[in-house]
Amino acid sequence: MSVRSLPAALRACARLQPHDPAFTFMDYEQDWDGVAITLTWSQLYRRTLNVAQELSRCGSTGDRVVISAPQGLEYVVAFLGALQAGRIAVPLSVPQGGVTDERSDSVLSDSSPVAILTTSSAVDDVVQHVARRPGESPPSIIEVDLLDLDAPNGYTFKEDEYPSTAYLQYTSGSTRTPAGVVMSHQNVRVNFEQLMSGYFADTDGIPPPNSALVSWLPFYHDMGLVIGICAPILGGYPAVLTSPVSFLQRPARWMHLMASDFHAFSAAPNFAFELAARRTTDDDMAGRDLGNILTILSGSERVQAATIKRFADRFARFNLQERVIRPSYGLAEATVYVATSKPGQPPETVDFDTESLSAGHAKPCAGGGATSLISYMLPRSPIVRIVDSDTCIECPDGTVGEIWVHGDNVANGYWQKPDESERTFGGKIVTPSPGTPEGPWLRTGDSGFVTDGKMFIIGRIKDLLIVYGRNHSPDDIEATIQEITRGRCAAISVPGDRSTEKLVAIIELKKRGDSDQDAMARLGAIKREVTSALSSSHGLSVADLVLVAPGSIPITTSGKVRRGACVEQYRQDQFARLDA
């Protein structure tokens, strides 16, 4: 479907397949086994028009409209209604206190919305939050579910009057204050085409008939928004959705939604694969068949090869093919998708010498002292290069540098942040190689390298730990720890003696044991096992292992560890140690 904008794509779907299912939301709050609520394409379009008509009374073209509602069909309708009205949508979660409120405050201040779209179940929280913001002109608050959404509507908005910007995707803020990535309709459309080309490279970018997208990811997160709302509309595919809470309550629900007659395309971060493998029982899967699954992409956080293997092994008896699991790399500044693994085969893992990798050189090896990394295809579109971030010169094969991205999926910048936009989106390569544009390049802030025509990702440059003069990826250290503890952990470096940095690991555990003595003995055994594993796998001695209860490590709204906050809490001795 060749269209210029999301509203145009929705209009085309409503015209071409009006009575086909568009979005189905599985509500597990009404019933433990789920209640399916479905909108057809014509119903969705009509509801979108009614929201747009209501918004026509608020502000003008290009003004911002925040969507702050629970996960559900009302959120989908609200987001699309904002676009239909020619407003710039701002996806957000419902304020609930703590980090969520800090994020909401930051987004509301930065975007200055003329309206907030919510629901009657969440309006009290939204009103209360907005009321705490004195001195600002309050936005109109609209309860979407109280509108007459199914009323006949002749609302129109000319295609050429839509602003080029579709929505602001605020970053998770794991290393800084959230910034609004300015996403255009073109960015979203192009990235959808790139995504389809990457995942369906062997079928000319076209999935088989009877395909559907399955997602529980939050709509305010880039992967949840694109996979859950934008991709179904741009492709004209049905979507089956539920909430993150429903998944966390019972991970088997995700597996159930994918074990359907249709060909499921789904996505989740690494932790979800771990959770599903550990907490889904054989009884949960009785009578289920995963053989129709098309693709499950793993992205949004570092993909751990051991987790993928556990997930594949766990569900193999239910006909899951390991080749459908596709490790993927992307970021909000590039809409969502940049690269994925090779199609038609299980994810490939390559071992590299840890010592050499710490020094910036990729040296394949076998045996101990290795860091296992997953390989990704170098995409044709967008263009990806590995660049020395200091000299802006392309790195030779096997040399670690910063991942730079160029293409029409890359945003123009951050909302009202010209200096930061120039630093991040205005990269220029010095003496580019043949076929390589000089610029502009998105500087991703991620380190990686290319060897044998494959790309490997190490992690966030800002998160790199420098211990005794060597660079270490916290993701690698955390993966080693999680193989033992299975819970969330954070590897950080803090100042030590003589101007050196020392390694500290914060580890979430449940304090188990028949007695306090048994529990303490178990904690001691875990500390010894972790210490030994870090020494043998990474050549590192850990200065302090801080064992804490689940939920103690500060995270972003998308579940990423806030390492800066961890460092501050550690320095202030604010972690409640289980073995104190």
From Swiss-Prot:
Activity regulation: Inhibited by acylsulfamoyl (acyl-AMS) analogs.
Disulphide bridges: none
Gene Ontology biological process terms from the UniProt entry: biological process involved in interaction with host; DIM/DIP cell wall layer assembly; fatty acid biosynthetic process; lipid biosynthetic process; symbiont-mediated suppression of host innate immune response
Catalytic activity: holo-[mycocerosate synthase] + a long-chain fatty acid + ATP = a long-chain fatty acyl-[mycocerosate synthase] + AMP + diphosphate; a long-chain fatty acid + ATP + H(+) = a long-chain fatty acyl-AMP + diphosphate; holo-[mycocerosate synthase] + a long-chain fatty acyl-AMP = a long-chain fatty acyl-[mycocerosate synthase] + AMP + H(+); dodecanoate + ATP + H(+) = dodecanoyl-AMP + diphosphate
Site residues, Important for substrate selectivity: I227, G330
Top-level lineage group: Bacteria
Region (Disordered): 421-440
Pfam families with a match to the protein in the record: AMP-binding, AMP-dom_DIP2-like
PANTHER family: DISCO-INTERACTING PROTEIN 2 (PTHR22754:SF32), DISCO-INTERACTING PROTEIN 2 DIP2 -RELATED (PTHR22754)
NCBIfam families: FAAL_FadD28, PRK05850.1
Protein name per Swiss-Prot or TrEMBL: Long-chain-fatty-acid--AMP ligase FadD28
